[in-house]
Amino acid sequence: MIVSTAAGDYGLADFAAPLPLAGLAGLAGGAGRWEVEIGFGKGRYLLRRCLDSPLDGFLGVEQVAEYQERFVARARRRRARNWVALRGEALYLMSAVLPRGFAAAAHVYFPDPWPKSRHHKRRLFDPETVDLVAGLLAPGGRLFFATDFLAYGELVWELLAGYPGLTVTRRDGLWDDGPRTNYEAKYIALGRPILRLEASAEAPPALHPLGREAALAATWRKKA
């Protein structure tokens, strides 16, 4: 697993796990307020946020090496310094590496819906692991989600609506700042329906009843 910043690339073994929030701020030029994007793909939205809000910190998680490297190259070329990009499996990183309750906003756009029933265990959102995503939010933080796979979107809606301390609303139409990802722009052009959700955290994040280690075990059961 690779940790990339404006200053260079590192191995995950170079850092304590879970990553301390102060350590993240040090990696991103002293940033205070944080946003995280899980599965940032080619990095269109993540880079835009970095450039638009240079005093905030942005953490991106992406498993595909080509996409992570593309974002890193573009961010360095634009001389953005307020970001950290982690290359690795999102469920593992959320359960074992990322701090809890640190993000003012979390973004999950068009995650793989794994439509075949035998692959559902690989989904980012399911009853065992929804708290890994929701648990990233600080009190008052917001989670933004979009998918074109409507059945999966309905499942995510139900999971978030039933999660303690979250208030969930459906978004009608585009985000206020327009399409946020390449997929979203493409699907809008094709006229494909998109389900968008916004959830607000009213309290500190919950956690798996048995704690972080149980959440990690649930993650690896999904991969088995």
Question: What label would you give each PLM region?
Answer:
Residues 116-124:
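Glycine/threonine-rich flexible loop motifs
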Residues 1-31, 167-224:
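SAM/dcSAM-binding transferase cores
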Residues 125-139:
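A short glycine-rich, Lys/Arg-flanked "PGG" loop and its adjoining helix->strand segment in the class I
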Residues 33-92:
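SAM cofactor-binding core of SAM-dependent methyltransferases
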Residues 111, 146-150:
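Short strand-turn motif at the edge of the Rossmann-like AdoMet-binding core
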Residues 96-105:
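A short acidic, Gly/Pro-enriched loop at the edge of an enzyme's catalytic core
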Residues 139-147:
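Conserved beta-strand signature within the Rossmann-like core of class I S-adenosyl-L-methionine
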Residues 128-131, 154-175:
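Conserved Class I S-adenosyl-L-methionine
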